[in-house]
């Protein structure tokens, strides 16, 4: 959420939609929680953030979810909006592996934010792609899951409401 606040301030955005993806083509479906649980955690994290919205838009789309299809569909459904793709530097490093990545590049603005272990050369970015200068927040969902599996507290890694939801529902706990 802190990163999203920084992006709102530095990237010239009106709002940020967190589109929960039911099936990322780069991840195994078995590794993901139930769609509704993941959406609920995003909703909890965004409470009190009027310019941030949790979206289940991809829940109604074919799986796996391809960003090109999502952006095209959202642009048709919301013609008064201009969508910008926000991705971490780690995703930018693999962007040429994405379905229809050239189409995304030619039709949508892309904003890249720093991620630990990934470096992006701002001078080499194509037109329409920018690197924002935000404070590095080196927390990943993988790290949160590893902490939980090891029985370590996740306070400070996720909002308290999300930590409570994870604990109350036994999510990511060792089996």
PLM segments and residue spans:
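Nucleotidyltransferase catalytic core that binds NTPs
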Residues: 1-175
């Amino acid at each position: 959420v802190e990163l999203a606040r920084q992006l709102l301030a530095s990237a010239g955005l009106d709002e940020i939609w967190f589109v929960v993806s039911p099936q990322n083509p780069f991840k195994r479906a078995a590794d993901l929680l139930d769609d509704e649980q993941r959406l609920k955690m995003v909703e909890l994290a965004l409470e009190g953030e009027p310019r941030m919205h949790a979206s289940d838009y991809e829940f109604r789309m074919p799986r796996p979810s391809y960003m090109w299809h999502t952006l095209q569909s959202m642009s048709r459904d919301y013609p008064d909006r201009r969508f910008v793709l926000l991705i971490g530097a780690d995703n930018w490093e693999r962007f040429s592996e994405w379905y229809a990545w050239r189409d995304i590049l030619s039709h949508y603005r892309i904003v890249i934010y720093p991620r630990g272990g990934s470096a992006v050369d701002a001078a080499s970015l194509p037109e329409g792609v920018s690197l924002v200068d935000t404070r590095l927040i080196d927390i990943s969902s993988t790290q949160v899951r590893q902490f939980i599996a090891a029985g370590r507290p996740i306070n400070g890694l996720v909002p308290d409401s999300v930590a409570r939801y994870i604990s109350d529902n036994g999510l990511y706990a060792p089996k």
